[in-house]
Amino acid sequence: MSLAFDINYRPKAPWFGGDLQTMSAVLSPPKVALDDADIEDLRIPADDGTEDVLLGQRLVRRGSDGPRQETTVVLLHGLLGDFDRDYMRLLTRHYLDHGYIVVRMNLRGAGSSRLLCTRNYHAGFTQDLTVIAQALSAREDTGRLAWIGISLSGNMLLKAASETPFVEAADQAAIVSISAPFDLQATATRFSRRRNFLYSRYLVNKIRKQMPLQPGLRPDQVEHLKRIKTIGEFDEHFTAPDHGYGSADEYYIENSAKRFVLDARLPCLAIVAANDPWIDDRPYRAIEWSKNPLLTPAICRTGGHVGFHAQGHRQPIYTAWSRSFFEASSKPATPTPSRR
């Protein structure tokens, strides 16, 4: 797909540097109203033998003759987020204004789904994406699916793009990842750096607040949670064993999207910033993207983590870029990509 994105765009004042781009939503929270949309609550049962339920919303802008686009945009949030985070609302608003149906989902155990789930999502938990795709594709009012994954869910989508169950369920979908932790080990290593101490502490504190609310958490696990100091320790003692991995390293190796992306069978746009304080861009640069014509990398000079505020753009540039990508990605052939 021949699309050109201005990866050397100038940052919009005052968001100069990766840290300010990253913290922009905290320092200047966007005010996004969605009160002109008809909202349908979604409940999608998991298919893994649990009674877990995935919760989401389907939104259509009110006051028109229905959606102008025959596409449903599915939005997935990042680590410790939910479907009502600021970036989710921004994307919802953008796509509603351009005539799309929007589905925004909570990942397993996130947000309002927390009390209905005994398991949690993780960076490679793609079976739930297949379940979501199957549920939406079964509806006559869905049309084509277009997926946007923010941060952790971006890794999930880039991994799922090579997996037959998801590819068949999503049927001619397209995928955009934004600030995905493409190499989970590299991301954990970056978080352990001294310069990222405040970010790490912020996320660990959120984990400590959210995890005790999870059904089935034992008292000894709650006590152990109080001693966790880094994301790596959390993955070692909770994420990995909870999902059958022997260690955090095994979990990282088995679920990093960089292992799978060259085998993608759906069009994928991967947006990341070189000055993202959380995500190392070097694993992105190490991939020979041209080996698979379905892949489009956008490794930007600036943008931070899920920031991407550019001069001349009212909204983060990933809103317009993702829409351009979806519009350009008509039904492609499904080639067998060459291996590394």
Predicted features along the sequence, with ranges:
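Catalytic nucleophile-loop/oxyanion-hole region of alpha/beta-hydrolase
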Residues: 94, 108-146
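Catalytic histidine-centered segment of alpha/beta-hydrolase-like enzymes
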Residues: 303-316
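Alpha/beta-hydrolase-fold enzymes
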Residues: 138-242
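Catalytic histidine neighborhood in serine/cysteine hydrolases
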Residues: 290-306
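Short beta-strand/loop motif that positions the catalytic acidic residue
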Residues: 264, 270-272, 276
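Short beta-strand element of the alpha/beta-hydrolase
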Residues: 69-78
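Conserved alpha/beta-hydrolase
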Residues: 81-84, 92, 96-116
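N-terminal cap/lid segment of alpha/beta-hydrolase-fold proteins
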Residues: 18-65, 309-312
